C-alpha cells in the first residue's frame, strides 16, 4: 500500500516537472531598466539619423536625483563659462600631442590692479568649473556655500578662478572634443595626460589673464594633487597652497579602486573601445563604476547611522535588484551620474590620478620623457610634416605584461630610492611656500596617511610654514566627500581654510 502511494507521488512529481518549474523565475527590474534605456537611446539615434537637426538623444533620457542626506551638488554644465583658447600644439608628458586645446573657466570677485589677489580653485575628478552660482549660471555650484562675499573664500577680498581640467567634458578639451585633424571625436585617440599636464594648461590660462603670481592655489581630492603640483612646477607663481583630501602621491588602495571602475566601464559592450559618440553610450558600465566610486567617497559609520541594514520595503520578497536602503542609495547615485559625465573622461582623468607621484625620481622620469619626445613637437611644428607622420609620431606602444602577476620579494627587487626620502626631495621646491594640508580620518579613497605623509615630507624638506589639520571620526564621518559638505553646525573644512587664506 505504502509502496503504491510512493510510486504515485513520484509519477505526479515527474509530470509536474515536465510542465512547470517548481518556482517562478525572479524578476529583475534593474536589468529591465538598463535595457530600456539602451532601447530608448537606439530609438532616439534612429530618429536623429532620419532628422539630423534633432536634439541630442540623451536629452530626453533622465535619471533620478538624490534627495536624502548631505550630497555633493554636481551637474552637467553646458553653459555659463568662459573659454581660454590655446591655438598652439601642446606636448603631453607621455608623448602625445594636442594640436590645440580649450579650457573652460568661471570667475567670482574682482581682480585687483596689480593682479595679486587671485585664487585658483582646482576641482575633483568629475566636477565642472561651476563652483558657485553667478548671473550667467544661477544654478548652485559644487562649493556654493564656501565661496562668496564674507564667506570662507571671500570674494570681497579675492578673485576666484575655477577651471574645468584638461581631459574633462564640461567645456575643456577632452576625449569627447573634436579632433581638428579629421573633424571626429578624439575618443581614445586622445593622449594620455598627467596632473602635470593639467597644471601646465592652467598656467597658460594664467598667462592669458596676466596673472604672474597667484595669491593661493586651493584644491580638494584631485584638486589637492593639482594644488601641490602647481607649487612644485612653478613655486614662483603661487603665494600659498591648500591641499584638502589630496596627497603628494596616489595610494595603492586608491589606484585599485579606480582601476576596478575603469575595468567595469571598459567591459560594457557599448563602450566600443571609446568610440561610442555616434551610438549608445556605455551607461550601464558608467552607472556601476559610479556605484563603486560612491562606496569609496563615503564611510561605513555614516551609512550605519543613515541606512543600517534596513530594507527599503520589508513587506516585499527579497530581490537581487536594489533591496536594502544602502543598495537603493548606490543605485540612485549611479543613475544620477551615468548620463552626466563622459565615460572616456572618467578613464583619462582617473588614470592621471593613479599616476600622480611627486617623488623626485618620478618627476625626473617625466622630465626626461618630455625631452625625449620634444622631437615630436618640433616635427609637428614643421610645415612639411604629413598627417600620416603625425599619426605615426603618436602611435601607441602599450602592451600587456609578458609575465602574469608575481609578488616580488623585497630582496629580489631592483634597488629603489627610499619612498619617503624620494618624496622629500620631490617636495623641496615647496620649502618656502606656506602649505595647508587637511585630511579626514574616515576617508576611504585617499587614506589620511596620505595627508600625514605629505605634511611630514614637506616639513622634512625644510618647509617651516606647514599647517596640518586632521578631522577625526567624531568631527566628520562623511569620508572623502567631507570637503563637499557644508553644515552650519560643524566647521568641517571652510573655517580652517578661511583662517589659512587670511593669515597675514
UniProtKB/Swiss-Prot annotation:
GO terms for biological process: cysteine biosynthetic process; cysteine biosynthetic process from serine. It comes from the Eukaryota. Transmembrane segments: none annotated. The active site is at 221 (nucleophile), 443, 480. Its EC number is 2.3.1.-. It is found in: Mitochondrion. Substrate binds at residues 290, 481. Residues 117-395 form the AB hydrolase-1 domain. The keyword Nucleotidyltransferase does not apply. Keywords: Acyltransferase, Amino-acid biosynthesis, Cysteine biosynthesis, Mitochondrion, Transferase, Transit peptide. The record marks 258 as: Important for acyl-CoA specificity. Residues 57-70 have a biased composition (Low complexity). Pfam families: Abhydrolase_1 (PF00561). Residues 1-26 form a transit peptide. This is Serine O-succinyltransferase. It comes from Schizosaccharomyces pombe (strain 972 / ATCC 24843).
